[in-house]
A protein has these predicted regions:
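Bacterial N-terminal signal peptides that target proteins for export
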Residues: 1-8
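Bacterial N-terminal signal peptides
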Residues: 8-17
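Residues within mature, well-folded domains
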Residues: 23-203
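Sec/Tat signal peptide C-region and signal peptidase I cleavage site
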Residues: 18-22
Length: 203
């Protein structure tokens, strides 16, 4: 039985690495609840080609083996009973659905903060700004980046309540601009057209 399991894992790896004729995909809505829940859990970490392969599988047996292989390939300590990465993803999922669903009707994992938390994990720094009359409520998250993945050594993300209401959304320097963070006032002590000035004021 163990040999058969390993053989199936090897087949899935080959399917991911080599182009094969596409088989008819199963719609997510046609999957059992267990597999729909799993796809929700791994939404932000599963590769597009992995998801394609998963949706081409025609039996729950194959899906179970695929899921087992998915986690094993990401296990930082293979050969041990624990899979720290899988446990961490489950932990993050529980956290975001509890913490980030408080100000929105959507599940926490669907929010911008939930998405970033699922991908990046807990930020090294998290500053909540809600008591400055010049600024809309916002949060500044900071991370140490992984240079091997092309990330800067240190970077920050801003989440803010657009117009001061609703859920926190990820700030975009190009799409939003610094003024979107600011409550209009003619006597501000910083340049509202400079994101560096606004961030410096937050800090």
């Amino acid at each position: 039985m163990k040999f058969k399991t390993y053989a199936w894992i090897a087949i899935f790896i080959v399917l991911l690495a080599v182009p094969v004729p596409a088989q008819k995909k199963v719609k997510e809505s046609q999957l059992g609840q267990k597999y729909r829940d799993w796809l929700t859990l791994v939404t932000y970490i599963i590769l597009p080609q992995e998801k394609d392969v998963f949706l081409q599988l025609q039996s729950d047996f194959d899906r179970d083996i695929f899921i087992d292989s998915f986690w094993k390939q990401r296990d930082p300590t293979p050969g041990t009973p624990e899979n720290e990465y899988r446990d961490e993803i489950n932990k993050r999922f529980l956290y975001v659905n509890k913490e980030f669903a408080k100000d929105t009707p959507r599940p926490g994992w669907m929010t911008d903060r939930g998405r970033i938390y699922m991908i990046m994990g807990e930020p090294q720094g998290r500053d909540k700004i809600g008591n400055l009359p010049e600024l809309h409520p916002c949060e500044l998250w900071s991370y140490y980046g992984d240079v091997s993945l092309g990330q800067p050594t240190y970077f920050g993300l801003i989440f803010f309540r657009r117009q001061g209401i609703g859920e926190y959304t990820l700030y975009s320097p190009t799409g939003d601009g610094p003024k979107s963070l600011v409550v209009f006032s003619p006597n501000l002590g910083f340049n509202v057209d400079s994101i560096s000035d606004v961030v410096q004021y937050i800090r």
